[in-house]
Amino acid sequence: MKFCSQCGALVARRTPPGDTHERFVCEGCQTIPYQTPKLVIGCIPEWEDRILLCRRAIEPRSGLWTLPAGFLELSETTAQAAAREALEEANAAIEIGELYSLYSLPHIDQVYMFYRGRLLNLDFSPGDESLEVQLFS
């Protein structure tokens, strides 16, 4: 980050008064553009004793199998995001269950949340970000 999104002045890394972390601070208007981890939300779509996985069509990890997941959008709950990602990546309708896992990956500034989800039917197919989708035991 080089310039302030509020006034366009240069920003510098320093510890603001009363803070404990070094942050970018605008040298003009003193705005602090806080940088926080991204939330990645997903679900574990279940049908009987099987799990629905998606083979990625895009980077990162193109061609590998994964659970449907993606970034939380503004104005949505984490449960809504989990259901949306299953719909976008696997055209799968699911009922969101309990939170299954929550873990931090500080080396890439991300926090992952996965919910259990029950597939409502077997009418699923690859979305734009998936090469194929399949149930696995």
Short names for language-model regions:
Residues 35-36, 56, 124-127:
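Short histidine-centered beta-strand/loop micro-motifs
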Residues 3, 23, 44, 53, ...:
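Conserved hydrophobic/aromatic beta-strand scaffold that supports enzyme active sites
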